[in-house]
């Protein structure tokens, strides 16, 4: 049965050749259905049972869950099927043709992170799945690069409770156990325009925004004083004012002003707590100027994430790799998968190549990644 499976490079080639771009712009956004069916077929060839799940609220996107073995616990290996869009002018190769050159495999999704599924499939062809004492699950998600809709839907809808999960994002095979979250908001003030010669007849949105920013800067200090995590290089939540726009002329009272800002919360500071703090900070402005201040999301929020250092998963992986787990500054699906079971982020390829023209993965990762997958499957599914 396993002979049906193409070789490692051919699997990789077909994954890269199947476009699965996710983008907020519907003109660039693509369904991942073809890729999901390709993966589903290969996992069935290995003897897995495969379930394909439409992801609600998306443009024809799907998750795939493959399962081998039965009982409680076990291991979940997870990854996303989508890639970012590419800038045609900056790529020197065809993004959808796997190109091997100078010990590197080039192509869109080679590192981030379609390639991870090639590593899983290639490793599992040599594993006798009938001997597993605990189940092995493979999760392929949709829309990680935009809304994380696939991972969110899985975590909200699944009844599965594996012992642990590994998400194969490109961490250069360094295990990651924590990262900050990310929220980005638009603060909008609706004033009342008028001629600057008669200030009393208008409501100046820029002045109200000044009041709002004063409140937000006080919140920034509160966050810095109240929340600490020594693991991070910047050990407190950050707040940034990134873009502001308002008004149209020096002699007009500004009718509208909008500020775009972001906050990067530490693990343990929940999105609802953060929302509460934000609303509390802006409440005095809203009270003074009813109906004039609104807060809207620019992107779906991502919570912070942390897998406890003392968890068995952390201990086992640190021992296998001979290195300690790290914390990072980028966001992944880990906070959502962590709601299902303890989760680490660990995979081949470098984050430096993700979202870059001429994206590649170094072939030096091939053997250690195969070894690692075989070891974690053996440890969590055979014992």
Curated annotation (Swiss-Prot):
Annotated catalytic residues: 82, 144
EC number(s) stated in the UniProt entry for this protein: 3.5.1.16
Subunit structure: Homodimer.
Subcellular location(s) per record: Cytoplasm
Annotated InterPro entries: AcOrn-deacetyl, ArgE/DapE_CS, Bact_exopeptidase_dim_dom, Peptidase_M20, Peptidase_M20_dimer, Peptidase_M20A
Keywords on record: Amino-acid biosynthesis, Arginine biosynthesis, Cobalt, Cytoplasm, Hydrolase, Metal-binding, Zinc
Gene3D superfamilies: 3.30.70.360, Zn peptidases (3.40.630.10)
UniProt-annotated binding residues for Zn(2+) 1: 80, 112, 169
GO MF annotation list: acetylornithine deacetylase activity; zinc ion binding
Cofactor note: Binds 2 Zn(2+) or Co(2+) ions per subunit.
UniProt catalytic activity: N(2)-acetyl-L-ornithine + H2O = L-ornithine + acetate
Entry keyword Mitochondrion: no
Required co-factors: Zn(2+); Co(2+); glutathione
Pfam family, one: Peptidase_M20
A GO cellular component entry from the record: cytoplasm
Function: Catalyzes the hydrolysis of the amide bond of N(2)-acetylated L-amino acids. Cleaves the acetyl group from N-acetyl-L-ornithine to form L-ornithine, an intermediate in L-arginine biosynthesis pathway, and a branchpoint in the synthesis of polyamines.
Top-level taxon of the source organism: Bacteria
GO biological process, one term: L-arginine biosynthetic process
Name of the featured protein: Acetylornithine deacetylase
Lineage: Bacteria, Pseudomonadati, Pseudomonadota, Gammaproteobacteria, Enterobacterales
Pathway in which this enzyme or protein is active: Amino-acid biosynthesis; L-arginine biosynthesis; L-ornithine from N(2)-acetyl-L-ornithine (linear): step 1/1
Database matches in SUPFAM superfamilies: Bacterial exopeptidase dimerisation domain (SSF55031), Zn-dependent exopeptidases (SSF53187)
Binding positions (Zn(2+) 2): 112, 145, 355
NCBIfam families: AcOrn-deacetyl, PRK05111.1
Family: Belongs to the peptidase M20A family. ArgE subfamily.
């Amino acid at each position: 049965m396993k002979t049906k499976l193409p070789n490692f490079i051919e699997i990789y080639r077909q994954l890269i050749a199947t476009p699965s771009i996710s983008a907020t712009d519907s003109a660039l956004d693509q369904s991942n259905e073809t890729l999901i069916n390709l993966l589903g077929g290969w996992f069935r060839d290995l003897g897995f049972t495969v379930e394909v799940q439409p992801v609600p609220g998306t443009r024809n996107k799907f998750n795939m869950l493959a399962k081998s073995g039965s009982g409680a616990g076990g291991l979940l290996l997870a990854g996303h099927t989508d890639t970012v869009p590419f800038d045609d002018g900056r790529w020197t190769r065809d993004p959808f043709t796997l190109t091997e050159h100078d010990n590197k495999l080039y192509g869109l999704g080679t590192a981030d992170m379609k390639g991870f599924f090639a590593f899983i499939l290639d490793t599992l062809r040599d594993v006798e799945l009938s001997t597993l004492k605990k189940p092995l699950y493979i999760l392929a998600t949709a829309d990680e690069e935009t809304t994380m809709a696939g991972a969110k839907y899985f975590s909200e809808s699944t009844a599965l409770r594996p012992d642990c999960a590994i998400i194969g994002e490109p961490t250069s095979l360094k295990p990651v156990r924590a990262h900050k979250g990310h929220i980005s908001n638009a603060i909008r003030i609706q004033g009342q325009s008028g001629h600057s010669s008669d200030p009393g007849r208008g409501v100046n949105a820029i002045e109200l925004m000044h009041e709002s920013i004063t409140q937000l800067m006080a919140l920034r200090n509160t966050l810095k004083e109240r929340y600490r995590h020594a693991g991070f290089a910047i050990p407190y939540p950050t707040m940034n004012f990134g873009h502001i726009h308002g008004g149209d002329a020096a002699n007009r009272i500004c009718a509208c002003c909008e500020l775009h800002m972001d906050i990067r919360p530490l693990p343990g500071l929940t999105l609802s707590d953060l929302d509460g703090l934000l609303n509390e900070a802006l409440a005095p402005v809203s009270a003074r100027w009813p109906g004039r201040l609104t807060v809207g999301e620019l992107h779906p929020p991502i919570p912070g994430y942390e897998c406890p250092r003392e968890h068995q998963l952390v201990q086992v992986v640190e021992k296998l790799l001979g290195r300690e787990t790290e914390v990072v500054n980028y966001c992944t699906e880990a906070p959502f998968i962590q709601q299902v079971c303890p989760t680490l982020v660990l995979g081949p390829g470098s984050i430096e190549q993700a979202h870059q023209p001429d994206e590649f993965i170094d072939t030096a990762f091939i053997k250690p990644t195969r070894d690692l997958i075989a070891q974690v499957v053996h440890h969590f599914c055979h014992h």
